């Protein structure tokens, strides 16, 4: 049974009676990377220290570190958890043979082809979130602590007596179909399509499906923690604003029984028996915690004169690399917006990129592709692979009346852009839902060049 009572936190702070009614939005604390404090039972958090000799209510104090102890203060991430049992209490791990969810990106040749897939089919047998993960591509490694893995998920069952944590990286969840209720050690995230959630490395959780079936995308970030991009001359506001990020208030389960703890460690899945729910954190404080963000709140920036700016203006979150100005991974979106540029080809232009681009579509239609790119589908354009609008989109935009704005509605596309080449997995290359004729979308782009008469 979930015991979720953030009103106790409010009463502790504001003298409000714990039984006072509250709205759903009070189950979250707002801000990005803030120093939060939350307790599901009043008077649990120690005052003025982290690790008292005896924690209130017979709990244990445990620190969860997401960065090195000596990381600069502005980049340091850690939280103190006050829980019923330490995280060390579980059985011995044994290896799980799992063929779909892994970090095996191969060592052979990577085709330079543009790649596209139809939506991952929904399962026909009971499949929970973990069993429904399907690895598409990746680079780097958990060992080196750089790079990413890109996965899809398709599930039709909730995780009941099963819990998961990822020691290899933080997880960026992008639901496309169906709502998720993610129960974590630090509280509960409710996610729906057009929202995203981030689960930090090491945080234990289970996923409940609210609508029976679910599908979406996952970016597993092995590198530097995701943070907001610098705004430069945009100024102090814009893009994803910090106040719109939400971190859950403390909540806990108090269950004992025969449960399974699944860990992802060094690219493999492991399982251990555990005799209690590990979601037993009664209170916590710190800045290393899950969070969610509603993509519909993104403050889109664009040109109001001419030309189409670089897609970096659509960045929601970025994972830094060791090269200044070059990300390990950028998460960008292409949301509803107005296009008003004059003397300009308004859709995204033709492009070859030193970075590699994995795209997905959460909702609607992507404005650079008239057909073939469906919600739940995906595309991969690796380093220097030419890409851009299909022939139908090019013809339409080339003849458009620019005295009228293009009002793009009913869309939400996104991109994981990575510094290193994304190596597609064997299962992705040979998947029955891969569109083998993807290149044909550019076949209609005919030569129209006419040299002017010689003078």
Swiss-Prot record:
Annotated positions binding Fe cation: 351, 357, 387
The protein's required cofactors: Fe cation
InterPro entries associated with the record: HgmA_C, HgmA_N, Homogentis_dOase, Homogentis_dOase_bac, RmlC-like_jellyroll, RmlC_Cupin_sf
GO cellular component: cytoplasm
A Pfam family assignment: HgmA_N
Keyword vocabulary terms for this entry: Dioxygenase, Iron, Metal-binding, Oxidoreductase, Phenylalanine catabolism, Tyrosine catabolism
UniProt pathway: Amino-acid degradation; L-phenylalanine degradation; acetoacetate and fumarate from L-phenylalanine: step 4/6
UniProt-listed Enzyme Commission number(s): 1.13.11.5
Domain of life: Bacteria
GO biological process: L-phenylalanine catabolic process; tyrosine catabolic process
Residues bound to homogentisate: 366, 387
Record family assignment: Belongs to the homogentisate dioxygenase family.
Subunit text: Hexamer; dimer of trimers.
The name this protein goes by in its record: Homogentisate 1,2-dioxygenase
Organism per entry: Xanthomonas campestris pv. campestris (strain 8004)
Species lineage: Bacteria, Pseudomonadati, Pseudomonadota, Gammaproteobacteria, Lysobacterales
């Amino acid at each position: 049974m979930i015991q979720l009572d953030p009103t106790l936190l409010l009463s502790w702070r504001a003298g409000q009676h714990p039984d006072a009614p509250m709205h759903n939005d009070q189950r979250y604390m707002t801000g990005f990377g803030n120093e939060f404090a939350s307790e599901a039972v009043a008077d649990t958090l120690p005052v003025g220290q982290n690790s008292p000799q005896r924690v209130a209510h017979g709990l244990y104090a445990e620190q969860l570190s997401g960065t090195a102890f000596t990381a600069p203060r502005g980049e340091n991430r850690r939280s103190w958890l006050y829980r019923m049992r330490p995280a060390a209490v579980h059985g011995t791990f044994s290896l799980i043979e799992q063929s779909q969810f892994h970090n095996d990106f191969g060592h052979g040749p990577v085709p330079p082809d543009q790649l596209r897939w139809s939506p991952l089919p929904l399962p026909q047998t009971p499949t929970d979130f973990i069993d429904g993960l399907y690895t598409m591509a990746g680079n780097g490694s958990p060992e080196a602590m750089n790079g990413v893995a890109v996965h899809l998920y398709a599930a039709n069952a909730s995780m009941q007596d099963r819990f998961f944590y990822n020691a290899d990286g933080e997880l960026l969840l992008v639901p496309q179909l169906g709502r998720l209720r993610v129960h974590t050690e630090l509280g509960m995230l409710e996610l729906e399509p057009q929202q995203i959630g981030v689960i930090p490395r090491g945080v234990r959780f289970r996923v409940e499906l609210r609508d029976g079936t679910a599908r979406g995308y996952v970016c597993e970030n092995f590198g530097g923690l995701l943070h907001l991009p610098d705004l430069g001359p945009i100024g102090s506001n814009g893009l994803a604003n910090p106040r719109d990020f939400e971190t859950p208030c403390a909540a806990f389960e108090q269950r004992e029984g025969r449960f399974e703890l699944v860990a992802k460690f060094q690219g493999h899945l492991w399982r251990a028996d555990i005799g209690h729910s590990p979601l037993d954190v009664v209170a916590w404080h710190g800045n290393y915690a899950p969070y969610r963000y509603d993509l519909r709140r993104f403050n889109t920036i664009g040109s109001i004169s001419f030309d189409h700016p670089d897609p970096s203006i659509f960045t929601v979150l970025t994972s830094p690399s060791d090269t200044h100005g070059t990300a390990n991974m950028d998460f960008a979106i292409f949301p509803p917006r107005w296009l008003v540029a004059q003397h300009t080809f308004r859709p995204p232009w033709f492009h070859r990129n030193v970075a590699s681009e994995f795209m997905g579509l959460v909702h609607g239609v992507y404005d650079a592709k008239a057909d073939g790119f469906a919600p739940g589908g995906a595309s991969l354009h690796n380093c220097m692979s030419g890409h851009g609008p299909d022939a139908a989109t090019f013809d339409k935009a080339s003849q458009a009346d620019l005295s009228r704005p293009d009002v793009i509605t009913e869309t939400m596309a996104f991109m994981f852009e990575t510094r290193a080449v994304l190596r597609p997995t064997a299962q992705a290359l040979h998947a029955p839902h891969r569109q083998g004729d993807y290149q044909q979308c550019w076949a209609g782009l005919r030569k129209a060049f006419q040299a002017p008469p010689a003078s």
